[in-house]
């Protein structure tokens, strides 16, 4: 009864302070309880309504929604330039309970005539953000505790708007609940006072009280967990999850570019690949050293390139076919990777075997054996990580740009980047938004800097299920002037 009294007090206070508006769709039958016309609760919810036919306006939609309570405001969204119907609307009820009833009864439950997908009825983005920092997740409860027991536990910290104990299909408690306060300050006070403060009878650990995750955060966490599992099972997805992934990938690309432009032939095995790195000795689960190797000769060596980490190096095959020469005592697996399975032949020059070793302790000699342009860039690439891209590119090279469809409507550019970042270096990411409604169109683009990352993302994320939808991830079609349609 205390909750009802506080709710009525808030409502009466608002009736005295708030002017009487006359918005679109404010008229309707008087609901039980005698709510005055045009007044709304302080905690009323603004709903976003999507997937409505474009020929329906406010007066056509009112009969559908006013069965759940008095409508404070109903506005069909239209293009500000053309005036055309956008197929969506904003809806606010006078009473908060009416909005909850409408969402429960209609969201993805009813398909309006002429539409292929069911109607969307959910809190607008502004409402979701506002409730995020006052809704708490409570774990490690006694499974015998009811909503009333949880209310008694949290009521000393403020006004509670909602309290729900999570239950299984058989009605038994799962030992956790959601509690929503009327303000962030009250929720924060409850966390500080109750989190870890006691252990409930029958619980395995102390009470857990924290801010509840949003749907967006839960979806992202589930995606990251799935990608992490794929990284363990699929070697090609292992490298991007290591601490040195961005640095190692950029270094590989830089070295490959330097050697390919120097006039020398580079064996394909010399370029590191995720599956080859795992063959090198003294590595961790992800194929990389557990800790960075100390720099040698004043150089900041990358994790895989130190004088102690590379027992043997193979000289590149020059235009004169000088030969592939392994160092004595080199690691067999490393020599296999570098030689790419080739049988080593004696070098024509006695100094070829020592040519590349100074690159890791200071290039000071044997410079006449190779062109200066071939050695100097390598020496500069070892001490420091490659610089970031100087300019933000809108698209990556061909084969590196992905089209993603069926994104959750709550996802923005940041969430899209977080979703695909584990697969490699992202040049740009963009979720397309409706300018009139500021709502996501549920599709976007992600551009990587190499095709391998794009293919890994397609392999892992295409068909990933989110709610009732599955992500569609595919290569963006290249621009072809000859086929504009």
From Swiss-Prot:
Subcellular location: Nucleus; Cytoplasm
Region (Disordered): 1-40
Residue stretches making up the RRM domain: 45-126, 134-214, 400-478
Basic and acidic residues bias spans: 1-11
A Gene Ontology term for the protein's cellular component: cytoplasm
Keywords annotated in UniProt: Cytoplasm, mRNA processing, Nucleus, Repeat, RNA-binding
Low complexity compositional bias, start-end: 12-28
Name of the protein this chain belongs to: CUGBP Elav-like family member 5
Protein's organism: Homo sapiens
């Amino acid at each position: 009864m205390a909750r009802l009294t506080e709710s009525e007090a808030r409502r009466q206070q608002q009736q005295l302070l708030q002017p009487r508006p006359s918005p679109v769709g404010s008229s309707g039958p008087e609901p039980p309880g005698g709510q005055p016309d045009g007044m709304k609760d302080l905690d009323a919810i603004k709903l976003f309504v999507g997937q409505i036919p474009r020929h329906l306006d406010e007066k056509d939609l009112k009969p559908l929604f006013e069965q759940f309570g008095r409508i404070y405001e109903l506005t069909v969204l239209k293009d500000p330039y053309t005036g055309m119907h956008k197929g969506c609307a904003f809806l606010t009820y006078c009473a908060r309970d009416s909005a909850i009833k409408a969402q429960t009864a209609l969201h993805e439950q009813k398909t309006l005539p002429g539409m292929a997908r069911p109607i969307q009825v959910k809190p607008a983005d502004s409402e979701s953000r506002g409730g995020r920092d006052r809704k708490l997740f409570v774990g490690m409860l006694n499974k015998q505790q009811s909503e009333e027991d949880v209310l008694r536990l949290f009521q000393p910290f403020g006004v509670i708007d909602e309290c729900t104990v999570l239950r299984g299909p058989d009605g038994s408690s799962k030992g956790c609940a959601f509690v929503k306060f009327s303000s962030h300050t009250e929720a924060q006070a409850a966390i500080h006072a109750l989190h870890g403060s006691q252990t409930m009878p029958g619980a395995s650990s102390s009470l857990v009280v924290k801010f509840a995750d949003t749907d967006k955060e839960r979806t992202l966490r589930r995606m990251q967990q799935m990608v992490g599992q794929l990284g363990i099972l699929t070697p090609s997805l292992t490298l991007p999850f290591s601490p040195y992934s961005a640095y190692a990938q950029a270094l590989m690309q830089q070295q490959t570019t330097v050697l390919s432009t120097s006039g020398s032939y580079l064996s394909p095995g010399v370029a590191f690949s995720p599956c080859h790195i795992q063959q090198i000795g003294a590595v961790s689960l992800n194929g990389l050293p557990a800790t960075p190797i100390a720099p040698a000769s004043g150089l900041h060596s990358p994790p895989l390139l130190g004088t102690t980490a590379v027992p043997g190096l193979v000289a590149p095959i020059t235009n004169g076919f000088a030969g592939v020469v392994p160092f004595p005592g080199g690691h067999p697996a490393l020599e296999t990777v570098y030689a790419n399975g080739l049988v080593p032949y004696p070098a024509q020059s006695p100094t070829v075997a020592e040519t590349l070793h100074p690159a890791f302790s200071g290039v000071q000699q044997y410079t006449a054996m190779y062109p200066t342009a071939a050695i100097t860039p390598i020496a500069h690439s070892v001490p420091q990580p490659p610089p970031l891209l100087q300019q933000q590119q809108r698209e990556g090279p061909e084969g590196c740009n992905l089209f993603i469809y069926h994104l959750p409507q709550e996802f923005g550019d940041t969430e899209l980047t977080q979703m695909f970042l584990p697969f490699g270096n992202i040049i740009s990411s963009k979720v397309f938004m409706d300018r009139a409604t500021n709502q996501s169109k549920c599709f976007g683009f992600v551009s990587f800097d190499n095709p391998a990352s794009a293919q890994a993302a397609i392999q892992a994320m295409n068909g990933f299920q989110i709610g009732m939808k599955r992500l569609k991830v595919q290569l963006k079609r290249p621009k072809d002037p000859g086929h504009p349609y």
